[in-house]
Amino acid sequence: MKTGIHPNYKKATVKCACGNEFETGSVKEEVRIEICSECHPFYTGRQKFASADGRVDRFNKKYGLK
């Protein structure tokens, strides 16, 4: 690899819209994000499950199978 062409890699503070902050490595000093693991519904357990029937399920309901 050539020397002097790569950006400097440093510690970066990641700030979420919910107020959570954590450190990671990046070429930027500060990274702002809209959603993180502290406020994302999948990680917090507030996830809503949509019950979408597939084509096979609709066929089975229609013809009384299973």
From Swiss-Prot:
Key words of the record: Metal-binding, Ribonucleoprotein, Ribosomal protein, RNA-binding, rRNA-binding, Zinc
GO biological process, one term: translation
Cofactor note (record): Binds 1 zinc ion per subunit.
Co-factor(s): Zn(2+)
N-terminal signal peptide: none
Keyword Ribonucleoprotein listed: yes
Cited Pfam families: Ribosomal_L31
Keyword Zinc (UniProt): yes
A single GO molecular function term of this UniProt record: metal ion binding
Xref: InterPro entries: Ribosomal_bL28/bL31-like_sf, Ribosomal_bL31, Ribosomal_bL31_A, Ribosomal_bL31_sf
UniProt GO cellular component terms: ribonucleoprotein complex; ribosome
Binding, Zn(2+): C16, C18, C36, C39
Alphabetical list of Gene3D superfamilies matching this protein: Ribosomal protein L31 (4.10.830.30)
Known partners and oligomeric status: Part of the 50S ribosomal subunit.
Family to which this protein belongs: Belongs to the bacterial ribosomal protein bL31 family. Type A subfamily.
Biological function: Binds the 23S rRNA.
Name of this chain's protein: Large ribosomal subunit protein bL31
Organism annotation: Bacillus pumilus (strain SAFR-032)
